[in-house]
Amino acid sequence: ITDYQAAAADADNDTIDIITGAKGANSGSIDVKSAIAGGGGSENVTAAVTNGVVTLSGSDAGLINTLSEWIDAVSVNGVIKKAADDADAVGAVAFQLNGNTYLVESNDTSNNNTANVSIVNVIELTGLTGVNAVADAAAANTILIA
């Protein structure tokens, strides 16, 4: 999508209709070093989700620098989860890469409180940066989902 509007509140934001209609729950410090292509296993990189937005931290966070690696990172168990007390991998999360924002959705239909990641959507929002939330209510700097 090349002209996504996320800068204003109320009805001005564009809405992305996704399968689950839900954002992923907050999570913190999930080890995602397995997403590094050619990594040796001793790297230090974790993912956290706040308001549906994934950020990486750790001394090797910069090694996750391709779309494929980012998708692998958000596919690690616990990054996308339904709720704080439900590990099912249901919902959408966003991340920024190379001047674009990506919305990635998992639809875990197992309903067994275990992460069974099933990526069903990867949506590129070309040129969109500064997103600080994924939500079902419009707000500034928010990807609006339904």
Model features per residue range: what roles?
Residues 2-146:
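Acidic glycine/aspartate-rich repeat arrays in secreted/surface proteins
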